[in-house]
């Protein structure tokens, strides 16, 4: 766990403005009263992971997107004291519309995936 002071001193490599990941990051740091100016922004998760591996800074990305590099020991994760980065996804559909068999299977697949592959708590920093 790193302190807020150490967190603020990091060189941040972030997703582009408008991405869901960036929006979560901006909201969390803003609510904590922290101002962060990224040293680099990219649309590519792979580019951000590679930049992190090469020591250019720390990135904030989805845990599922970094698993291969994490499992290979190329990167590690850290928690920032008092900050929690999380993001929820929702399947939405019109309440009065007929759901096809394919749509129902897709919804079931999504629910099963979350149940079969739950993520440990992770705040999104590495």
Identify what each model region corresponds to.
Residues 1-12:
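Flexible hinge/capping segments at coil-to-helix
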Residues 5, 49-50, 104:
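Alpha-helical segments flanking ligand/cofactor-binding loops in enzyme cores
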Residues 3-5, 30-31, 67, 81-83:
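Short secondary-structure boundary/capping segments
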Residues 17, 40, 81-82, 95:
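Structured beta->alpha junctions
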Residues 89-99:
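A bilobed periplasmic-binding-protein/Venus flytrap-type ligand-binding module shared by bacterial periplasmic
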Residues 10-32, 99-103, 107-108, 114-125:
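Secondary-structure junction motif
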Residues 11, 58, 76, 90-92:
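Residues embedded in well-ordered beta-strands
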Residues 23-77:
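Hydrophobic hinge/microswitch elements
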């Amino acid at each position: 766990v790193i302190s807020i002071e150490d967190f603020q001193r990091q060189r941040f490599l972030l997703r582009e403005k408008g991405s869901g990941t960036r929006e979560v990051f901006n909201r969390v740091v803003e609510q904590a009263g922290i101002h962060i100016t990224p040293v680099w922004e990219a649309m590519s998760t792979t580019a951000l992971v590679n930049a992190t591996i090469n020591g250019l800074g720390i990135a904030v990305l989805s845990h599922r997107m970094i698993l291969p590099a994490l499992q290979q020991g190329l990167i590690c994760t850290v928690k920032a004291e008092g900050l929690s980065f999380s993001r929820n996804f929702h399947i939405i559909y019109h309440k009065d519309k007929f759901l096809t068999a394919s749509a129902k299977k897709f919804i079931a697949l999504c629910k099963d995936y979350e149940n079969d592959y739950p993520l440990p708590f992770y705040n999104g920093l590495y």
